[in-house]
Amino acid sequence: EDCIPKWKGCVNRHGDCCEGLECWKRRRSFEVCVPKTPKT
């Protein structure tokens, strides 16, 4: 199964984002795969 590219929805598929991406809940919106932010 293909991974989910950047800015595409990942609702109910939190583990399916492509490498380097993470599922993020946008405010007043749905969950999308976004580039992982460095944890500082």
UniProtKB/Swiss-Prot annotation:
A GO CC term attached to the entry: extracellular region
Disulfide bonds: 3-18, 10-23, 17-33
Keyword Disulfide bond tagged: yes
Main location: secreted
Positions of transmembrane segments: none
Keyword Secreted part of the UniProt annotation: yes
Record annotation: effect of changing residue 28 to A: 14.5-fold decrease in ability to inhibit rASIC1a channel
Domain notes: The presence of a 'disulfide through disulfide knot' structurally defines this protein as a knottin.
Additional information: This peptide is present at only 0.4% abundance in P.cambridgei venom.
Protein name stated in the entry: Psalmotoxin-1
Organism listed in the record: Psalmopoeus cambridgei (Trinidad chevron tarantula)
Lineage per the UniProt record: Eukaryota, Metazoa, Ecdysozoa, Arthropoda, Chelicerata
